[in-house]
Amino acid sequence: MRLSYFILILFLAAAACSTPGKNLGANGWTDDFGQAGFDAAIGAESDPTSIAFFQKSVGDRVYFNVDEFTLNKDSKAALDIQAQWLTENPTYLAVIEGHADEQGTREYNLALGFRRARSVQEYLVAKGVSLLRLKTLSFGKERPAEICSSERCYSKNRRVVSILNAGTM
């Protein structure tokens, strides 16, 4: 009887130590949040339906002025192209990431990044992209594109990036 309990406890302990497998998606593996891993296939830049084409030719980001979340003329033009591509490629979902520069508090920049992401989301929905295909989140100043304390870096960090995923969120 003791041996049975010992084997059961040993089995449960071993199972608790195992790591879950990777989630396989259409474009490689994804984590528990549906984000593509570093080895995910993004397709060829020459394939107009690929993530690589979207990033290179369509453009995956728009920029903002200091302390602003309203879209300027250049941002709207870039988002018009994104909206058209997303409409023509309905199998993709987008995570819209809002970012801010390092100026200001963490809390303020998280809120500003969220407002920026929401303004992009609302614009894409107004252009015909289904709200069900769009998810917003904010990183505030936590994930800078460039690190330095100059306006050149700040302007690169005040952005929204559209990250594509194939499948469900």
Region locations from a protein language model:
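Periplasmic peptidoglycan-binding/anchoring modules of Gram-negative envelope and division proteins
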Residues: 52, 57, 63-97, 121-126, ...
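Alpha-helical scaffolding within the catalytic cores
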Residues: 48-49, 81, 149
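N-terminal targeting leaders that direct proteins to extracytoplasmic destinations
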Residues: 1-57, 70, 77, 167-169
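N-terminal start-of-chain detector that recognizes signal peptides
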Residues: 33-37, 43, 65-68, 82, ...
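Intrinsically disordered, low-complexity acidic/polar segments
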Residues: 22-23, 73, 105, 145
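Extracytoplasmic/periplasmic, Sec-exported soluble proteins
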Residues: 46, 67-75, 88, 104, ...
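Surface-exposed loop/turn and secondary-structure junction residues enriched for glycine/proline
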Residues: 4, 61, 65-67, 74, ...
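Periplasmic OmpA-like peptidoglycan-binding domain that tethers envelope proteins to the cell wall
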Residues: 99-168
